[in-house]
Amino acid sequence: MSFCLTELHLWSLKSTLHIADRDIGVYQYYDKKDPSVSATEHGNLEEKQRLAESRDYPWTLKNRRPEKLRDSLKELEELMQSSPCVLSKWKSKYICQLLFGSGVLVSLSLSGPQLEKVVIDRSLVGKLISDTISDALLTDSFIILSFLAQNKLCFIQFTKKMDSLDGNKRLEKLSALDLKISYYDIPGPANRTIDRHLAVNSTQDLVVCWWPLVSDDVWPWTPVSSEKDRANMLLLGFTQGGLEVLSFVRTEWSPLDVHFGTKQPYQVFTVECSVSVDKEPMADSCIYESVRNKLHCVSVTRIPLRSKAISCCRNSTEDKLIVGCEDSSVILYEAHRGVTLLAQAELRPSLISCHPSGAILLVGSNQGELQIFDIALSPINIQLLAEDYSPKETLQFKKFFDVSSSLVQMQWMAPPVVFQKPKRGEICDLLFLRFNKGPLGVLLFKLGILTRGQLGLVDLILQYIHYSEVYEAISILRSMDWDTLGQQCLIGMGTIVNHLLRQRLTPEREAQLEASLGTFYAPTRPLLDTTILEYREPVSKYARRLFHHLLRYKRFEKAFLLAVDIGARDLFMDIHYLALDMGELALAEVARRRAHDIDVESVSSGVELLGPLDRRDMLNEGFASSALMPEGENKFPGLLPSIGSTHMQTLQQKIPNGPSSRWAIERRTEEEEEEEEEEEEELCTDSSGATTWNAEGELKEDQRKQDIGDVGSLRMVHFGLV
């Protein structure tokens, strides 16, 4: 079974951590003042120290000038005890910046999972109107601060540019940048302590300031409050070296998250906690657009939930929204397919973080627990490096603390996509962890050399196939979009199909093959014409291999339907000759006639057909519903519909047909079609091994997912073709 192997590195010198000698996957720093280690008193601690030093993990921190790393870390741990951390930002893969409520800015320089340098900057201490900072924005040219109790924003400009040389490693204090500090009033409820959050767009010319709706919406002193005072989302711009409120709106529901789009810098994405007409909890995914410096809501997608949302996260491409709920359920909404997935977590999902590659997502609780799901919400086991193999569903951090400390933040160590494009082949295997009042640390994912340290969608499919977890691999493939990830989809499909074609054909594997090819031939939403033209030839090679695989096991009905979808003359002739050898004369005649029709069509049109002729040219509904085993013996009632019920597209003339559209070259006369359908129906009636698929045409649902169709309108997606 596939699982993630990890190491936990805690950046702490405290003796309150409870790390056993045999915990070779958990590390902390030790002080030189500690008494000498004795093998008889401390068991295997000496061996663990030798193991750490052999891997270039420091056992004790150096205190050389000017860094004085050990003293700086002790000062940082004391600071975390006295002041809350309001912001942590990864300036690059090597530098993390922490801003505390008192105005202290701490920069951490890393080398792998280990601390290399700690710089504590107190340039802002005593220069602000308040030491209760709510949120902050840190860029290379300015800082913006919001406060808990004041309706003001602090705008700090750098009149001197930051040195760009070796920007990934260089740490510079704010005092060297000649700060210019100014304050600006903003609308909103006065005399109230509110968490005012900030976000900036990729072009760094717009800022949004937002806060949750106040529950006790009472406005004293004025009979009618102005719309400006009731607003909870502000759009700000930069004018003449300062900040200006450009627009303000009051959201319909209380927002859970607000940020600018990564690809559309003038769109604002929000997630709002709403309620349906039946008083059922929902999440509204809204898009606001800035038009002439005014915010307008242009899109609202309502997602039904099982309980109130408490956390949310979007993937890097922003086509998937993950919502964590109070009842430990995790909801994933896929925008490109318009479907919703549900999984039940083993913990309360207070924190959610999606890997930059979009392959996995991590769910954490304040109690110090961590669980991993793939992007199709299949759970993945996790284990710390140890002598024994013991992967589990969750990872427990709390057992390493003598004093209880809640997990308040987890973040992948990578710069935001809006500020820096990830380099090709760059490894992202470190998860930053911050516990309340300390310590800080990272969780290192040991991804191995076979994937070259990568954790992408294709890498995850390869891992699933390595452990023969085909359903999980197919669900990953189904979640991928051919229009944007075509090459990765092709590689993933090839991996799954090649694995299945090497094995004996069974009803289950046949359904899995259909599901894999169906991601291209029968997508939930039609693919772009350019996508079909680019990938139909390599995908058809896999379809041809499946066709001959079906013939090898004498699955004539399915092979015929697949040949109809592919629309190639040689496939029908293969059926014709094999059917003659097997004594299936009726099938041989139908296949020969279909091959002849394709010849006629090719001559008349001057091109070789690459797809089916027409929906009415296919076998009738009774023939298309033929199954694998005699009635009463179907042990796979939740398998997929046959490939013959899917649609291929030849991109020449679009003919609407029910919910999907098919492509044809020319229509045949109704008399010819009726005559052939009668023969095919007679052939289907004579087939002794034909039964029907289940009415839903769905692949058996993973037992770890729960069907909530009875409790709401949430749509469940099963593995297989829809």
From Swiss-Prot:
Organism in which the protein naturally occurs: Mus musculus (Mouse)
Biased composition (Acidic residues): 671-684
Localization terms from the record: Cell membrane; Cytoplasm, Cytoskeleton, Cilium axoneme; Cytoplasm, Cytoskeleton, Cilium basal body
Region (Disordered): 655-710
The gene coding this protein: Wdpcp
MF terms in GO: phosphatidylinositol binding
WD repeat extents: 305-343, 344-383
Quaternary structure note: Component of the CPLANE (ciliogenesis and planar polarity effectors) complex, composed of INTU, FUZ and WDPCP. Interacts with CPLANE1.
PANTHER family: HOMOLOC-13, WD REPEAT-CONTAINING AND PLANAR CELL POLARITY EFFECTOR PROTEIN FRITZ HOMOLOG
Role according to the record: Probable effector of the planar cell polarity signaling pathway which regulates the septin cytoskeleton in both ciliogenesis and collective cell movements. Together with FUZ and WDPCP proposed to function as core component of the CPLANE (ciliogenesis and planar polarity effectors) complex involved in the recruitment of peripheral IFT-A proteins to basal bodies. Binds phosphatidylinositol 3-phosphate with highest affinity, followed by phosphatidylinositol 4-phosphate and phosphatidylinositol 5-phosphate.
InterPro entries: Frtz, WD40/YVTN_repeat-like_dom_sf, WD40_repeat_dom_sf
Membership in a protein family: Belongs to the WD repeat fritz family.
Protein name: WD repeat-containing and planar cell polarity effector protein fritz homolog
Biased composition (Polar residues): 685-694
